[in-house]
């Protein structure tokens, strides 16, 4: 009798995706983040589902309902802390996953890469609307500042902003619709993640060498299931350490005060995972210019496959590109730091230089490095 795993229509899909999937024999721990992201998404959906049972999306009661969850609901404090810090873990894994894709040339699987960028944008949108829900000071003012950027769009901007708000400012209608968005978007993320996997399994995984691995494949189970399990243990360990010992360290103290439209916080800033883009937005004095730079900072990922000039796929054997890659990583850390600082010197000039360097590295220096490495590898005799 044939194995049910290989014949049953549903089991067959699972089998081809997670059990008998041929995987390169040399993929490193940098390939763990896909499965970690899947688990992060499941954690966020489950904890979010239980939070939604007790949350009320009304400006008068939203803040109190979150306090009620933490004080009166059984393990509500744990569910909320896991959800808030789970978002940070999600973005940490996302950034490392994208970084891995850039370093090892995984972006040359164009469909997988483009769906991945759409996924990144959708997760960012989900996190943004979610941050507004507790209706603290930073929630309210963050929502006001970011949605107000829409008004920079010529001609239709103001109408668009008021349409998103459901009124003339961020208010009850905005909170209600943001809760609706925050509930629906994760399921769209799940659908996109399935499409992402579908395209990935059309080509098979890339590997650190960047060389076609077809001649040396091994089954996903048990080799990579056990490897992913180790990654999951570390993920849970870090998440639990964060959620149990220091749950508020990544949040903003202003969010412990209920939203007050009459009192602006001294420094309005988003969560840490948006600070790099926020720094780029603030580095341009013009409002529309800032919005375009903000969009470009993420959408630039879509043109990375077009900027690949090297004869080798991976950066593993390309020291010049490696150096530029790590400068880019350090630059992103710098932008994250600047995004959290007040708008004054020397932070303004550092932010502007870091923003320039970000675009310069991706658009000019890295493609040039690829051409230079091609030249250096050519026989000179």
UniProtKB/Swiss-Prot annotation:
Cofactor(s) listed in the protein's UniProt record: heme b
Any one annotated GO CC term: respiratory chain complex III
Signal peptide start-end: none
Residues that bind heme b b566: 97, 196
Localization per Swiss-Prot or TrEMBL: Mitochondrion inner membrane
Source taxon at top rank: Eukaryota
Protein topology in the membrane: Multi-pass membrane protein
One Pfam family this sequence matches: Cytochrome_B
Quaternary structure and partners: The cytochrome bc1 complex contains 11 subunits: 3 respiratory subunits (MT-CYB, CYC1 and UQCRFS1), 2 core proteins (UQCRC1 and UQCRC2) and 6 low-molecular weight proteins (UQCRH/QCR6, UQCRB/QCR7, UQCRQ/QCR8, UQCR10/QCR9, UQCR11/QCR10 and a cleavage product of UQCRFS1). This cytochrome bc1 complex then forms a dimer.
Family under the similarity heading: Belongs to the cytochrome b family.
Other facts: Heme 1 (or BL or b562) is low-potential and absorbs at about 562 nm, and heme 2 (or BH or b566) is high-potential and absorbs at about 566 nm.
Role this protein plays: Component of the ubiquinol-cytochrome c reductase complex (complex III or cytochrome b-c1 complex) that is part of the mitochondrial respiratory chain. The b-c1 complex mediates electron transfer from ubiquinol to cytochrome c. Contributes to the generation of a proton gradient across the mitochondrial membrane that is then used for ATP synthesis.
Protein name per Swiss-Prot or TrEMBL: Cytochrome b
Gene name tied to this protein: MT-CYB
């Amino acid at each position: 009798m044939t194995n049910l795993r290989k014949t049953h229509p549903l089991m067959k899909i699972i089998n081809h995706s997670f059990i008998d999937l041929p995987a390169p024999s040399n993929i490193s721990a940098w390939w763990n983040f896909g499965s970690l992201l899947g688990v992060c998404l499941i954690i966020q959906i489950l904890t979010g589902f239980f939070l939604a049972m007790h949350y009320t999306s009304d400006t008068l009661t939203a803040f109190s309902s979150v306090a009620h969850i933490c004080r009166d609901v059984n393990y509500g404090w744990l569910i909320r802390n896991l959800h808030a810090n789970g978002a940070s873990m999600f973005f940490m894994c996302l950034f490392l996953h994208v970084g891995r894709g850039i370093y090892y040339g995984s972006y040359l699987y164009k469909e997988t890469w483009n769906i991945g960028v759409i996924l990144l944008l959708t997760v960012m949108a989900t996190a943004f609307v979610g941050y507004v829900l507790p209706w603290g000071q930073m929630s309210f003012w963050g929502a006001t500042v970011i949605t107000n950027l829409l008004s920079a769009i010529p001609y239709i901007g103001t109408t668009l902003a008021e349409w998103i708000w459901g009124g003339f400012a961020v208010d009850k209608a905005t909170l209600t619709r943001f809760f609706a968005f925050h509930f629906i978007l994760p399921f769209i993320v799940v659908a996109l993640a399935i499409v992402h996997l579908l395209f990935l399994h059309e080509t098979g995984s890339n590997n650190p060498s960047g060389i076609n691995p077809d001649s040396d494949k091994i089954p996903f189970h048990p080799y990579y299931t056990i490897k992913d399990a180790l990654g999951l243990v570390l993920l849970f360990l870090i998440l639990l350490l964060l959620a149990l010992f220091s749950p508020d360290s990544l949040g903003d103290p202003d969010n412990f005060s209920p939203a007050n439209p009459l009192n602006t916080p001294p420094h309005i800033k988003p969560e840490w995972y948006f600070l790099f883009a926020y720094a780029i937005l603030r580095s341009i004095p013009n409002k529309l210019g800032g919005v375009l730079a903000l969009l470009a900072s993420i959408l630039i990922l879509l043109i990375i496959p077009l900027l690949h000039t090297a004869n080798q796929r991976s950066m593993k054997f390309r020291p010049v590109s490696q150096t530029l890659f790590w400068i880019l990583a350090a630059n992103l850390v710098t932008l994250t730091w600047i995004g959290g600082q007040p708008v004054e010197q020397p932070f303004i000039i550092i932010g502007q230089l870091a923003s320039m360097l970000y675009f310069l590295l991706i658009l000019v220096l890295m493609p040039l490095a690829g051409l230079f490495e091609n030249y250096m590898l050519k026989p000179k005799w």
